[in-house]
Structure formats: structure tokens, C-alpha cells
């Protein structure tokens, strides 16, 4: 029992809390962006895809460094957030959530968009013929049909957010009890030979 008492659970709790909130944000943002992409022309859709999928091709540490540049207290956005909302992103738990969300978001977006593209347009036309609004068609026709793809995107997003290391370590750091997630803590233990 002494072994169990010596285990610090804060990295696990911080990781779970971060991953859950990042997944919720990516879920709604990914579905909204995927729905918007459905309505765009091919060139505009390609540009949007390139921008939203950028975190997939960037190394996570580079994504974290870019977030650090944007949200630093020496940059306009960081200054604005601090002066108006007392929100500090760098070296804080909101930084963990932001890093995990940015890195995991493309997985939700890609899965939602692929699921929406698989929906038969005849269902949408039938809903319009019945006089349903676009929102009602989306909510009662498109979402249920695309449900399995959205569910798989949600699972992938959660898993990616839970295991995020690179961007989190760059933006939020490694503060025990505050920003040390499981991935960041495991890296520290392997470097300090605490295993």
C-alpha cells in the first residue's frame, strides 16, 4: 500500500481534464468547420482544408512554438487576453488545453467532413422538399447518418489530446500539479531516470 500512496495522481487528472475539454472544443469546432466546408466551392474548400489540417503536418513542438509566439505576454493577443480577461495562456493550464485542442482538432475536422460527404444528397433534397429548414435537416438527417464517422473522430481526438506532448511542453511547460500531463511527466521521468 505504500507504493500506491506514493503515486502522484495529478498528471493523470490534469491529462484527463485537458483531454476532455480539448475534445469537447474540437468536437463542436470540427463539426462547425466541416459543415461550413460542405457549402464551399472546391478552391475555397481546398484552402480551408490546408489551413485546418496544418497541425497534422507540423511537428508538435513547432505548433507549440507558434502558439507560444502568438500567446506570449509580449505579443498583442497575449497582452489583450491578460489586460481584458486576466487570462494567461503561457505556462498555465489553459495553455495545456489550447495546445491539445490545436493538435487534435484536425482529426475531428477530417472525420466529420468525410462523414458529411458520405451522406446521400437525396436525403437532404427530401428534407428540403418536406419544407425543413437547413438547420433541421442538418440536425435530424445529416448528423444521425454521419454519426459513426463523428464518433470515430471524437475517439481519435480524445486519444490525440490525451497523449499530446510536444505542443504542450512548449506552451504550458512542466509545472507539477498545474501543467504536468502524463506525457510530459513520463518524458521527465525517463530523462531523470526515475523509472
Which residues make up each language-model segment?
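Membrane-water interface segments at the C-terminal ends of transmembrane alpha-helices
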Residues: 2, 6-117, 141-166, 170, ...
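Transmembrane helix boundary and interhelical loop/hinge segments in multi-pass membrane proteins
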Residues: 111-125, 134, 147, 182
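Canonical alpha-helical transmembrane segment with a positive-inside/aromatic-interface signature
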Residues: 128, 137-138
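Glycine/proline-centered hinge or cleavage motifs at structural transition points of membrane proteins
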Residues: 130-131, 144
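Basic (Lys/Arg-enriched) interaction patch that binds polyanionic ligands
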Residues: 132-133, 140
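Feature of multi-pass inner-membrane transport and sensor proteins
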Residues: 136, 172, 177-179
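Short hydrophobic, aromatic-rich alpha-helical segments embedded in or entering the lipid bilayer
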Residues: 176-190
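A membrane-interface signal for the N-terminal entry of alpha-helical transmembrane segments
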Residues: 193-195
